[in-house]
Amino acid sequence: RDLALATAQFWAATPSAPLHWDRASEEGWRKVPSLAAGLPHFASGFMRNWGRDTFIALRGCLLITNRFAEARDTLLVYASVVRHGLCPNLLDAARQPRYNARDATWFFLQAIQDYVEMSPEGLTFMSQTVVLKWPVRDWDPDLVHLEPKTVADLIHLILQAHAKGISFRERNAGPGLDAQMTDKGFDVKVRLEEGTGLIYGGNEWNCGTWMDKMGSSSKAGNKGRPATPRDGAAVEIVGLLKSTLRWVAGLDRGAFPHAAVTTSSGAELSYKEWDARLQHNFERLFWVAPDEKAPTPLRNFYKDIVGATRNWQDYQLRPNFPIAMAVAPELFSPQNARQALALAADRLVGPLGMCTLDPFEAEYRGDYRNDDDSADKSVAHGWNYHQGPEWVWPLGFFLKAWHHFYGKDEGGSSAGRRDVFPWLLKHRSMLHNSAWRSLPELTNSTGSVCSHACPAQAWSVATLLDALHSLEADEALE
C-alpha cells in the first residue's frame, strides 16, 4: 500500500515537460502528463522524462496500480519517436530526443510485453496504429520497406535494425549537445554477433547503459571519460533481449506476423533460432567458473559484460545480472544462479539498495558527492556515481531473482516472504518517515544518506512494488 501510494506523485502534468509537445499544443499541456524520473531534481524540462527510467518504472508505477491508460499513452508516444531502431534516452517532449542509450530500447520492449500481459487490452495492443515522427527513410533507407503501421511492426523493425547493425553519429554532436563528451563518444554503434546471438555496442568514450556517468572535471582529469562505459554485451541487455525473443517467438502469427530478421551477412535468422542461440551460449560466455582464468579472485558469479574494451571490466561484480535473471530466468543454471545471488547478497546488498560495484574492487568509492571539486579523478564531480553508491532500484530485480531461484523450501512451499521481507524492513521505515513518503534514488555506503540524490525516485518505488506484487501473485497461485 505504501509503495503504491508513493507512485502517485511521479505522474503529473508540468508546463515545461508534457509527454508529447505536439499533442500538448493541440490539447493543452494539462491533458498531457508525464512520468518524472525523480523528485525534485528530475521534475521539469527535458530532464523530467527519461526512456530508460520510464520503462523500468512503468510496470510498478502504472501497470500494477491499474493506470493502464497512462501506460498506454506513454508507450505509444515513445513508439512514435523510435529512430535508428532505438528508443530515446531523453524524450524532451518528443521535440529533440537523444538516442544515446543502448538499453532504453530493451526496457521499452519489456514494458510493451508487460502491458500486453497485464492490461485488459491484451494482444489487441499489438495492432494499435503507430506513425513515426521520423520515417524510416530518413535514417535507414535499407529498411524503408519495414515502415511500421502497428506496434507489432515496430517491434519487428527494432529487432531487424539491431540484427542488421546500427551505426550513426548523434545529431548536433558537439559541446552544444553534450559539453563533456569527447568527439568519439557521439558515435553510436550496435551489432549482432550471429554465432552467439549477443548484441554488442558502445565504445570506451560513451556510456550507453544506466551506469552513464560522464566525467566533467578538467582539474582531476576525468572530463570526457565515462566512469563506466560498459561497452560490449551488457548482461542486462542480453537478458532483456532474450525475454523479448522468447515472447515474440511464442506469439500467434495473427498478433505478431513476423518470423525472422535478416542479419548483416544477409542470412535469415528466425526469432526462434535467435532465442535458441542465446540460450545455448549464455552460460558459457557469462559464467565465471572456479577454474576460469580471470583478473579477479572471485569465482562463481556472472560477468557484467562480455567484450569490454577494458577487458578486466567484464569481470566486475555489479548488480546487473539479477536484472537478466528476473526477466529471463531460463538463461541461468539454477545451481549457478543461486551461487551468484548468494555472493551478491553478501557483497552488494545494502540497507536500502545494492552497491554498484563490489566493495572489494580497487575502484570502489561508496560515497557520492556531485560537488566534489578535488583533484581526485575517482570522485571529482561525482565520477563515482556508479562505482559503489547503493542504488535502490536494482534491489527489486534482485528480490524477484532471489524468489525465483531460492523461493521454495525443502517442502516445496514458498519461502519468499521469509527470505524477502527482512530485506525490506528499512524501506518500510523510510516510506513512513521520509518527508517525501518515498524511496531515494541511492544512498551512500552502508545506507547512509546521500544529499546529492533524489529523495524520491520513480524506479526505486516501482521495482520494489513489482517484487512484492510478484511474490504475492506466486503465493496466491499456490
Where are the predicted features?
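Acidic, mature catalytic/reactive cores of soluble proteins
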Residues: 1-478
